[in-house]
Amino acid sequence: MTTETRSLYSQLPAIDRLLRDSSFLSLRDTYGHTRVVELLRQMLDEAREVIRDSQTLPAWCENWAQEVDARLTKEAQSALRPVINLTGTVLHTNLGRALQAEAAVEAVTKAMRSPVTLEYDLDDAGRGHRDRALAQLLCRITGAEDACIVNNNAAAVLLMLAATASGKEVVVSRGELVEIGGAFRIPDVMRQAGCTLHEVGTTNRTHANDYRQAVNENTALLMKVHTSNYSIQGFTKAIDEAELVALGKELDIPVVTDLGSGSLVDLSQYGLPKEPMPQELIAAGVSLVSFSGDKLLGGPQAGIIVGKKEMIARLQSHPLKRALRADKMTLAALEATLRLYLHPEALSKKLPTLRLLTRSAEVIQIQAQRLQAPLAAHYGAEFAVQVMPCLSQIGSGSLPVDRLPSAALTFTPHDGRGSHLESLAARWRELPVPVIGRIYDGRLWLDLRCLEDEQRFLEMLLK
């Protein structure tokens, strides 16, 4: 060991001496004595490695307390951090899908802070049923006889099949054997539920007679799966629920539908593409309809099943129901969200999902033009900052081929180097509230459809 190396090692402080420093008192109060000591030991090991490898001290050795504070502050950040979603995908699965309405946030907060009547009947002081209040709301909105709530729509499909068709066959069109994110496939779910898949028709064309010929003494259900995350176009044929229900009645076989996204309002009245609604399928005579709570409905993650009373009763009594049931926070948020649907005239103002989906391209364009000047002044030395038209998508497998006209701020490096775009995107991901855009066609795009807090956005990007 050289004299210089020995001298550098001698400059490393003892942990006890560091802890006696007044600057460490608040750190110990905030993060705990044990964690501070653990980190100091780790940092001393790091410093020794740097000395050994490069014959220098790390820069942070000049202020140990500051470095400890920086590291522990970063460590203490929640893994679920708020971000500004400027990806152009409104219901972004990786960013948590639907934003909750203020009424839902308030309801969840109350449910978290206090005991609630989750399974308690105030009328007779007996045990109640956790789905009761929501079932009443859902029946009022959809016209169903009863309803059941589980923790997501994949769970809803699993429960629906396991409780009504285990050990038997379920007839489904080949063109509806969907796969959604996370390799969730209808054939796999059927297998897990103990059902036998009987696929009929072809990928692009399925006729009523295909279902009829598939039915046998072991058939439990005729099933429709709404292909919400893809579209088959061209030379196609599919029968709708009303026609399938008529066939089911003739053959005395129930019809069930996995609707996927599930919208409780006619989106076309807001200028959006129409999606099938649960109430339409219930009116057509479908026995069970499942759909998601956190997609087009705009609520928390939940799986909702509405339908005939005797069918729902089979789901409620199945052992899987307890394993898949929703907790009090989910139920509180979902109830508050559903109550908004009782006043549809105010829905686009109070439901964030609908509010964002219905923002006009003109309004977003004006917003982009308002923000372009200060951002161009700040970033103009490296990037050309422009306002450009773009197309937003709904996301989460909803209306996959439909796009919403929008406007974006784009950042194009003057030198054309893609590494500069990656670097800029990385810098924005390190902001106190990360800004998430997308890199495409040699530009970094910030689709402003979901930007509502302009002031906070500007303050962070102009630092």
Swiss-Prot record:
Q: Which HAMAP family match?
A: SelA
N6-(pyridoxal phosphate)lysine PTM positions: K295
Give the Gene Ontology MF terms in alphabetical order. Answer: L-seryl-tRNA(Sec) selenium transferase activity
Query: What gene name does this entry carry?
Result: selA
Which pathway does this chain act in?
A: Aminoacyl-tRNA biosynthesis; selenocysteinyl-tRNA(Sec) biosynthesis; selenocysteinyl-tRNA(Sec) from L-seryl-tRNA(Sec) (bacterial route): step 1/1
Task: Say if the entry is tagged with keyword Cytoplasm.
Answer: yes
Keywords for this protein: Cytoplasm, Protein biosynthesis, Pyridoxal phosphate, Selenium, Transferase
Cofactor(s) this protein requires = pyridoxal 5'-phosphate
UniProt EC number? 2.9.1.1
Which reaction equations make up its catalytic activity? L-seryl-tRNA(Sec) + selenophosphate + H(+) = L-selenocysteinyl-tRNA(Sec) + phosphate
What protein is this chain from? L-seryl-tRNA(Sec) selenium transferase
Main localisation? cytoplasm
Where found in the cell? Answer: Cytoplasm
Q: Might you name a Gene Ontology BP term for this protein?
A: conversion of seryl-tRNAsec to selenocys-tRNAsec
Which GO cellular component terms are attached?
A: cytoplasm
